[in-house]
Amino acid sequence: MDIDALKASHMRHWNRFHQLAHSRRLTGPEIDELSVLYRQVTADLAKVRSQNPDQDVISYLSGELLHARARLTGTSGASLWAISRWFRHDLPAALYRIRYVTIAIMLIFIAMTALQTWWILRDPAALSMLGSPEQLKNYATTEFSSYYSQDTNASFMSYVWTNNAFIALRVVAGGITGFYPIMALWGNAQNLGISAAVVIHYAGPAHFFSFILPHGIPELTAIWISTAAGLRLFWAWLVPGRKTRGQALGEAGRSMITVGLGMVILLFLCGAIEGFVTPSDLPLWLKITCGVNLTAGVWIYTFVAGGRAYRAGVSGDLDEDAGYATPVI
């Protein structure tokens, strides 16, 4: 690599980077621009170090990066900016990276659940293995619906949120094993299929879907996304590409932590629906609309905001300059 040619082709954005890093005040768009340039200059520094370690250029870029990093973290309102950037760029980009895996998992889950439900409904022997007719009827007509009103709305919401958030984070973290997310997905599909078969057989499909759909659609979406995130972690370990296994796993891990935190937020909203909307006297269409709108919002957020952020070079990494790419003099 010709270092002079590199300097000539990159000097324009290096100068802009210097100008922003040394500005006394930065607007919101300028902070975003500085953040983007920070990643570009970090990549430039890595290229120089690996292909033509010119000490003058390395010292210059390292100094500029250190100054910019201090500028970003020391900017008034930087915490609010970081939170805003996380919602506008990091989280949607991380979701966008696993969008197709999430869709595939969704289809597999629906197929497994439908198959389990169909098999139990068509086979009286399979249904009888789940309990006596009296027990199953009591579950379908009483226990299934009373579950959603067993406590105060706020307490029940808190319970389901913390329980589901823990499951989602465990699925993401357990992704490194490769099999844990699949086992969790299979278990959820089987349990939902059994519940669906029993309730549909004894109380009818309307009774089942009226209690499941309002919160179930976005809640299951969170589980599917968490499963995809966990499997992405396993894939990074299995197939690191041109990076070392540690680098690939570290980057994927930080990105998937972003997804995990996003799912905690989504499941909080699901918990609010399950705790306050599902057991309420609202019209069924309005209950289902709440869940559908939340789910649609997640997918729009993923494809629109996520696609935009991903094309801008954002990966969802919690600290894209961390570890081996940290600029030091």
What name fits each language-model region?
Residues 1-84:
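Soluble N-terminal domains of membrane-associated systems
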Residues 139-159, 209-218:
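Short aromatic-rich membrane-water interface segments that cap or initiate transmembrane helices
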Residues 117-142:
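Interfacial/capping segments of alpha-helical transmembrane domains
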Residues 152-180, 194:
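Individual transmembrane alpha-helix segments
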Residues 93-111:
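Alpha-helical transmembrane segments and their helix-start/interface "positive-inside/aromatic belt" motifs
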Residues 107-122, 218:
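Hydrophobic alpha-helical membrane-insertion segments
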Residues 174-329:
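Generic detector of multi-pass transmembrane helix bundles and their immediately adjacent loops
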Residues 82-98, 147, 155, 246-247:
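Cytosolic juxtamembrane amphipathic/interface segments immediately preceding
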